[in-house]
Amino acid sequence: GELESQIQDIDRKKLECSEKQEFEEAASLRDEAHTLRESLQAKRRAWEEEVRSEVVEVTEDDIAEVISSVTGVPMQRLAASEGERLLAMEGELRRAVVGQEVAVETVSKAIRRSRAGLQDPKQPIGSFFFLGATGVGKTYLAAKLAEFLFGDEEALITVDMSEYMEKFAVSRLIGAPPGYVGFDEGGQLTERVRRRPYSVILLDEMEKAHPDVFNILLQILDEGRLTDSTGRKVDFRNTVLIMTSNVGSREVGSGGVLGFQNSDEDAYQAQIEGKINDAMKKTFNPEFINRIDDTVVFKSLTRENITEIIEIVLDEFKKRLVDRDIALRITPGAKSMLAEKGFDQTYGARYLKRTVQKLLEDPLAEEILQGNFTDGSRIRVTKKGEALVFDEERDSVDLEEEKKPETAG
């Protein structure tokens, strides 16, 4: 520490004085170093006595945390009052996933069924087919489900099936055969599940996968395990298998379905689901669809949904600024403009995120780089014409919660 550094400096000066034959100065430095060494030893003895008298208690939670970090098994979650959490599952997921009540309810029921012991123990916790247009929350629901079940969004294993369109690529899921390149690396699916047996597996864009991929998935759905190229059996029984597809959504498009107006929402949605389900049955084999726990058609997002999603997107953006101690207060007028310009039924929430990036993040980044705002700034974002403007907010206002509604601008 600091005393040790001082002693080293004094010893160095003492040596220099000795070389210059300044013996009186050297003797004085020697005495000073001796005093500091005695002080250092006294502090060290006091610290050792304090450590010896203090008993460190290791609790069950500490042991559970260590086991979780080593094995990837979420011990803390398993030890919690699981029943209460599962009964409140819909409410927690709905706060994050907007406008997809049917999807959230379907997934929640299947998870509860499995955790209650009513599911076949040989099969995964749940298997789902998520269908619908782009940007409606299919991948996002999978990520939030991983966070809810296993306490971490990192428990989501994503496999892009566009990488497995060719027959020769299919073997990479379970590992290359002996003698082939990549044999020592293990399977891109099996190895990740072996290292993290409690996880949500997301197979994205299933319609692009080679037909041989479905033979592998049939074994997972039937037996809950796979044998990789090295002969190891990989357990899938503690995973949730989610497959996504945009099949049928392009045909439906954004122009409605013949015979129904968009205002007749229930009939319109039922007709869309029928079209997408028909397209799914033409694309995937019956023996595969028959083994899936449930198929969910995600609804297209409405303007009201976008208004709710903008709050989630902006909250995530504010969290990214916490490290720099920068706080934003975005006025209702600014939020309304972002929601209005970010609404596109064809592209869903992804278009909203691009709008926020273009109208909010890019201009704010330029302001920060120009030195107009620094760490610790309190920034108010308001609407001015067709753009957002930023100014320093010096008043003692609550930057996280807008207590009073403001007029646009």
Where are these regions (language model features)?
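AAA+ P-loop NTPase nucleotide-binding core of proteostasis motors
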Residues: 1-409
